[in-house]
Amino acid sequence: MTGEILIFLAAGLIGGTVNAMAGGAKLFVFPLLLATGLPPIAANVTQGVALFPSQLPAIWVYRRELLADARTLAWQMLPALVGAFAGAVIMVNSSDEAFVKVVPVLLGISVVAIVLGPRTTEFMRWAFPGGRLKAATGVLLAALGFYGGFFGAGLGFMLLAVLSASAGATIGHVNGAKNLFAGAIQTVAVGPMLVSGLVDWVAAICVLVGGLFGGYIGAKLARRLPDKLARTGVAVLGVVLTMSFLFS
């Protein structure tokens, strides 16, 4: 049991460090939880419960920007929250066998989101000019809500791209909106996870504690490493993990 606790703490530490540097904590936490013998869906539920509080401090930091545009953000958030609840309900009622089959695809999506970054925003503005962008944003936010409730790795990058394309606001405002949406999506998704009975509470608490220390370490490292280098490192490791799922 001591060995498992160390792995849980390491998962949180690595996830928190990576999240603070470039994002994508679930790329690393999920495989480490699987390595301890947790079933795939239990591992996904456990990491969802353990990692969702990490979004809340960021929402508080951006509270002034968010309150200034609260009505618009609330309307935009509705489809995302509906999608999040649906994604979480479907996930906790899926079989481990079916979930494992889609994990490589989900990990691949998150890696692509990390690699593309701001270029996704440029593509959206090109693909949906004028009034079509607003409708496309609603559909995409619903889809991202579903993805966030179902799995959620790389969700922050995807939200940042969609919100940047539609907002036309300052980067601080968009970052605040991204954290708000990610926190709201994960909070809604946690409901079905908590009542599912699949949470491993020892693992969840260890990941949460490790994540707090990892977040501090990652923030320190992020000041010294260029954003592009950190993003590339996370993406490369993500590709390795995805390949290991494909060929395992």
What residue spans do the PLM features occupy?
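Selected transmembrane alpha-helices and immediately adjacent juxtamembrane segments
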Residues: 1-37, 125-175, 182, 205
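Residues within membrane-spanning alpha-helices of integral membrane proteins
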Residues: 5, 48, 103-107, 111, ...
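Membrane-embedded alpha-helical segments in integral membrane proteins
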Residues: 26-38, 81-92, 147, 186-191, ...
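Membrane-interface alpha-helices at helix entry/exit sites of multi-pass transporters
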Residues: 38-48, 67-75, 168-179
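Selective hydrophobic functional segments
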Residues: 45-98, 102-105, 186-233
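Transmembrane helix exit motif
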Residues: 57-67, 105-129, 242-248
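Hydrophobic alpha-helical transmembrane segments in multi-pass integral membrane proteins
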Residues: 86-87, 141-151, 189-197, 204, ...
